[in-house]
């Protein structure tokens, strides 16, 4: 409440998928950001709620569902910071070899497109909620994604209705040429 009175605009939670006890404690000890932001959503009404989630070590369906859920819980205040995860040590936590820089950004472009596509599987008016007529969802307004790309195969649709914002905000802070291209082609609308 104090933050909202102080015109605070966004709570942004970074994330790190690797614990290095030699690093600064803020990089080592972290709550999972979407869970924390969901709790914070119940005590705020205006502040945006942004979380970092990796496109290299996550899957698009789960990310789309989680941010759509946060958007519903918060009344349309969710934001996703899409990162490719530069720390090679993270790969060991997922039983895989860390992809090189170029490959991570190729994956990220497809990942972001799939997430946005899943958010768009539900038309704005798909949830009818007609008690008298006995119709809750208009199936003609819910569409499969049927994405089959180089890195991801996702059928869809998402199993949560359209987010209050339509699509939660997507952020990306990579400053390399690949990061700028990701923002230009896949993130900016």
Regions found by a protein language model. Name each.
Residues 4-5, 38-45, 71-75:
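Acidic (Asp/Glu)-rich catalytic clusters
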Residues 31, 47-60, 99-102:
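Aromatic/His-enriched, Gly/Pro-containing loop or helix-boundary segments
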Residues 185-189:
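Conserved small/polar residues in nucleotide/adenosyl-binding loops
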Residues 10-30:
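Glycine-rich, proline-tolerant flexible connector loops at the mouths of alpha/beta enzymes
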Residues 25-49:
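Alpha-helix-loop-beta-strand connector modules within alpha/beta enzyme cores
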Residues 7-15, 49-50, 80-83:
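Short beta-strand segments at enzyme active-site cores
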Residues 23, 59-181:
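Internal, glycine-rich beta/alpha segment that forms the wall or movable "lid"
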Residues 2-6, 182:
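A short, Lys/Arg-enriched amphipathic alpha-helix followed by its capping loop at the start of a domain
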């Amino acid at each position: 409440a104090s933050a909202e009175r102080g015109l605070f605009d966004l709570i942004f939670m970074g994330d790190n998928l690797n614990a290095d006890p030699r690093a600064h404690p803020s990089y080592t000890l972290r709550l999972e950001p979407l869970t924390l932001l969901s709790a914070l959503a119940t005590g705020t009404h205006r502040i945006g709620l942004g979380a970092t989630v990796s496109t290299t070590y996550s899957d698009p369906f789960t990310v789309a569902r989680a941010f759509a859920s946060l958007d519903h819980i918060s009344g349309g205040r969710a934001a996703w910071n899409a990162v490719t995860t530069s720390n090679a040590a993270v790969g060991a936590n997922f039983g895989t070899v860390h992809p090189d820089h170029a490959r991570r950004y190729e994956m990220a472009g497809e990942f972001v497109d799939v997430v946005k596509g899943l958010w768009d599987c539900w038309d704005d008016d798909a949830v009818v909620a007609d008690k008298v007529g006995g119709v809750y969802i208009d199936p003609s307004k819910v569409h499969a994604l049927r994405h089959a790309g180089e890195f991801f195969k996702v059928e869809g649709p998402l199993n949560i209705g359209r987010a209050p914002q339509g699509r939660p905000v997507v952020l990306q802070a990579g400053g390399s040429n690949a990061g700028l291209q990701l923002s230009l082609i896949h993130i900016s609308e």
